[in-house]
Amino acid sequence: MIDKQKLYKAMDGLGYRESLKGTDFIRQAAVIMAADRRAMMTKDVYPAIARAAGTSPARVERAMRAATGAAMRSPGWGEAWRELGGWDHPTNAELCARLARECDDEN
């Protein structure tokens, strides 16, 4: 189970803005991936979020990339991301999996 407060704090520290839909989609994806470590982004995660949001999986993926792009332009992204053990530009799957691991209650 994921600690949602920890997830919100981690994403805030990385510079994600609440005003972007992709930020919420990333949170939802991290929760899905924490519940099922074998969930695949294109087959499981994007379609599940798209159904809940009433949109297409492609738009979910694009919104997540846009939110990450905006966060990467914020001050402190590099340092905060490296603290999570990442490198310069994560894919959506890498980001969500790392957030799921970092914010898991069992950690």
Cite the ranges covered by each PLM segment.
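Basic, alpha-helical nucleic-acid-binding regions used in initiation and control of genome expression
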Residues: 3-12, 20-24, 28-29, 36-107
